[in-house]
Amino acid sequence: MWRLKIADGGSDPYIYSTNNFVGRQTWEFDPQAGSPQERAEVEEARRNFYDNRYQVKPSGDLLWRMQFLKEKNFKQTIPPVKVEDGEEITYEKSTAALRRAVHFYSALQASDGHWPAENAGPLFFLPPLVMCMYITGHLNTVFPAEHQKEILRYIYYHQNEDGGWGLHIEGHSTMFCTALSYICMRILGEGPDGGQDNACARARKWILDHGGVTHMPSWGKTWLSILGIFEWIGSNPMPPEFWILPSFLPMHPAKMWCYCRMVYMPMSYLYGKRFVGPITPLILQLREELYTQPYHQVNWKKVRHLCAKEDIYYPHPLIQDLLWDSLYIFTEPLLTRWPFNKLVREKALQVTMKHIHYEDENSRYITIGCVEKVLCMLACWVEDPNGDYFKKHIARIPDYIWVAEDGIKMQSFGSQEWDTGFAIQALLASNLTDEIGPTLARGHDFIKKSQVKDNPSGDFESMHRHISKGSWTFSDQDHGWQVSDCTAEGLKCCLLFSIMPPEIVGEKMEPEQLYDSVNVLLSLQSKNGGLAAWEPAGAQEWLELLNSTEFFADIVIEHEYIECTASAMQTLVLFKKLYPGHRKKEIENFIKNAAQFLQVIQMPDGSWYGNWGVCFTYGTWFALGGLAAVGKTYNNCLAVRRAVDFLLRAQRDNGGWGESYLSCPKKEYVPLEGNKSNLVHTAWAMMGLIHAGQAERDPTPLHRAAKLIINSQLEDGDFPQQEITGVFMKNCMLHYAAYKNIYPLWALAEYRKHVPLPLGKNLNQVVNCIGQSLYKKYK
């Protein structure tokens, strides 16, 4: 059976940590583990997922949950509650539902204080890792038989009915992910017509029916060129000379969004080397299987700009194609010939590799994310197949692997800190501290130990890095990359804990560490009042015209985000109350400008576009929280009134809210089909309305929403898995498996705290008894 291990560094001599691996989560397969009953439960979970895979596409993340609940011998002892039609929700019933959710989720806390969870969903994460291991000869070492079995399961279970795979698990089929998945199946031993339910034959038919892999988007062409199934001359140039451009140029790497920079850094190295993996018999077979014409007859120069229509979200503007053409026709022929190949290209490759090593070292070889991880790892192998750099990369592969009932997938890079910050706030909102003191103390300890203690090493500004000391990352301290909203939420948790009894929640964080966090937040605000996520924004907007990906938008430069801005506003308002003397004027200006930013970018319908969650419901919850923190109310702020109107219009007949992921790419509100509701969306909308004072005006919409959440709760206190709720770069969805627990729990907590409710029969009896006793005593 598969087992999740927590904060375990293992015995690999090539792995190291800044905080003894706090937050690390790795999976291992133990063939001896598990009773026959436990194994049967796992198989049943797999079968249930497969049978319902077209109805609910994200996993319920059940394997580790089964493990943890078994290890802790958890039994739900609080009876379930239901609210009948026409029945009023009482304080007693809301408390029972809340306590059930709190006790269940507390039992899922890991030993180091964080809450594990899947953070995956894109279907282009895993295949490149398999390809990299195949190229380097480490496939069977890194992925033994059980791993390969589960990788194949994941591919089979997420194949669309038309035979293809989407950009993400809920998406329509694309050439990019269909070709990658097909190649992955073939590498893992399936024949051209093999796989569960004829997976390979159906996939190949889809590929050929849509023009073959000459219609791959640019990232796909890059990976196929690396693998030897495509020719580099069929790709647009990615010159490593980019890394030696003068800093005054507008397209200098320092001005790029960090993820864009980190992807094209190793890509440009591999392109500059024109690296191609070993041409094995399998590669020769794939050349025959994936094209609509013989491989040797492909006109590579003419396929550079081809892309399947299913893959295009951001069509290349003409000016971009002209730029690639000029580089292709004039620049590359010069840079690949003497003397420029020695004078310029070799130097550019050396500088690029220097940046790769710097980023690897400063992230303990986790790198900034999974796409970059595989490319940097391969670049290190190309530089030296037997070198320590590559071995250190191999040691960190387990940090990206996640196992659930739908198989093995590759994580974005883990959401440990992000999920835990919200989980703690939800639990604190429940006002059940007396029942969950040890849970809160462990969570507090994890948050404190996960704060980044140092800036990147050396002259980090020359390596295009920003300060990170005092920040929190999305995942764990070893990752090292500061994120503004993760920092805001981590800091908020520490501030909330600082006003609680230390004998219950542990000692509060030192003020200097809090000040470091504030410094990071202040450094990331733009002139327009908005907050960037990773590094200061400010590059010229026209650079987005150079976005060479076809399936993402807004990836070239850093931008300001509603969620980051609102998170920081709420946190700095609280910080200002507790530490009124620290950078008072700067914080006041930050808050004032941030509030102005939120009001300026509100959509015409009263909503806010969510950049990291689906979509307008998510953004509106954050924005209303930020505005409420600075004293904006329904009565004194037009933006709040418009937002409330938007949310009330979107409420469904059953009392919930349900927004399709299509809202994100379309940038307009799209409800779920069939009048469906989603509990996570319902929770976000509820909390947004509570921020806006809905309880005082008309609590009826809140009662209707709370009824849906209470009646949807499962027997053990869990909530059902529904549609995917996370997103990045407008067009790709991300499955946050923890959200189904955190947000319904949190919404119930806020509902119980802010909405006046009748006590209920049993509580009324208790109150009457107490009243009678006091009356007799003092009469």
From Swiss-Prot:
SUPFAM superfamilies: Terpenoid cyclases/Protein prenyltransferases (SSF48239). PFTB repeats lie at residues 148-189, 514-556, 640-681. InterPro entries: SQ_cyclase_C, SQ_cyclase_N, Squalene_cyclase, Terpene_synthase_CS, Terpenoid_cyclase/PrenylTrfase. It is an enzyme of class 5 (isomerase). The keyword rRNA-binding does not apply. Signal peptide: none annotated. The active site is at D485 (proton donor). GO terms for cellular component: lipid droplet. It comes from the Eukaryota. One of its GO terms (molecular function) is beta-amyrin synthase activity. Its EC number is 5.4.99.39. The keyword Isomerase applies. It catalyses: (S)-2,3-epoxysqualene = beta-amyrin. Keywords: Isomerase, Repeat. GO terms for biological process: pentacyclic triterpenoid biosynthetic process. Pfam families: SQHop_cyclase_C (PF13243), SQHop_cyclase_N (PF13249). Oxidosqualene cyclase converting oxidosqualene into beta-amyrin, generating five rings and eight asymmetric centers in a single transformation. Belongs to the terpene cyclase/mutase family. This is Beta-amyrin synthase. It comes from Betula platyphylla (Asian white birch).
